[in-house]
Amino acid sequence: MQISSLQYSCLISFIVFIGSTYIVLTSQNINLFGQTDTEVEQPMVNDTRLQIQEYSSGFKFPTGMNFLGPDDILVIEKNTGVVKEIKNGTVIGTVLDVNVANVSERGLLGIAISDKPRYVFLFYTETDKIDGGKILGNRLYRYEYDNGKLVNPKLLLDLPTIPGPSHNGGVLKMGPDKKSVYLVIGNLNYVQNETFITKAQNNKDGPPPDGRGGVLRITLDGGVVDNKGILGDESPLNKYYAYGLRNSFGIGFDSLTGNLWETENGRSTDDEINLALPGFNSGWREVIGFSKDTPEFNPENLETFGGKGTYREPEFIWRDTIAPTSVLFMHTDNFGSKYKDNLFIGSVKNGTIFNFPLDKTRTHLALTGPLSDKKADTNHETASITFGRNFGIITDLELGPDGNLYVLANYKHDGTIFKISAKQGTN
């Protein structure tokens, strides 16, 4: 069945967060939340030295998680605006319940936790009185954790919600310096209206950036990092770390170099992995995928913000869409040298986790064989980079304080956290 770019965008919205019955991903019909246990393949990893445990479950459309401490996790739910605390795999309570818009990709979308001082950062589409009420904004708040509750909210960013309702992104990560917060936000599904297509979407004659279509970074208090913007001094341009993004659900930092890596969802093909250095331009709306595959691409049409922004080709693409989500670097010895410091990517299609080693410079992926051209032309070509599959709709990957891999996914009838660890005596 052929689907248009607009149809595909809408379908991915349902796939990732809504869980609509019998929706289409490429040509396959998938009943995501009407399955019986016998109809769902069990999660598996290719390495027989590793094991999978269902750590916790019962969440409603979870979109992110973060560790407060050993065996102490905060999980956010997209549609309810609820933040739950889990200790030793058991939900012990709700630490916060905020009012959110929850149509399509709006909702409670991102969480990050700083160490010193201990703050919890949340990104969500806020409404006035009830879930689904009057929309106030896409907002980044800072909270304090106190005795099982999140208190003392401080508004750090207030961003547009239109045109919407998809491509909100929302993933948060603490910077390598532990003193900054990074947020990825898409273009909010722009329409063919120049008002909504800003310079951050490579519209050189468009209006100034308004906070959409990029990676933003701020201090723990909401200020400009180092008191100087990468691309310019005007607000909110001074908060942009990267731009030219269409629709991303994943950012993560290389634990060895501090470099930021990002996943990008294509319109109907060419999902990307990008190395996002400061001032990175992902190329949207002029190009997605490799520029050589876009005959009409002209680099002169790219916005550079006076030479401060730089377009960079993707480090990898999937021709057949897989809807990449979470980005994680395996900074642990638990699984052995085979995986240590590799790049792991979660995805929607088949609930697959991909594993990529990096080259010696750690600015490129170490790809061989049919993947040496930096692209997967068929699903068969991805066998060598597949770590595990059948996890459902993966929304987050996190390393626990114990060095094990935790996978947050919409699996079967609800949200589940899986724990992947080495079998005793195998590492």
Regions found by a protein language model. Give the residues of each.
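Beta-propeller domain segments
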Residues: L32-V45, R106-L108, D177, N187-S384, ...
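Hydrophobic membrane-insertion alpha-helices, especially the h-region
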Residues: L11-Y22
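Acidic, Gly/Ser/Thr-rich repeat motifs that build Ca2+-stabilized beta-propeller blades
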Residues: Y22-L25, N29-V191, G250-F253, N259-G266, ...
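Hydrophobic alpha-helical segments and their boundary regions
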Residues: Y8-S9, L96, G392
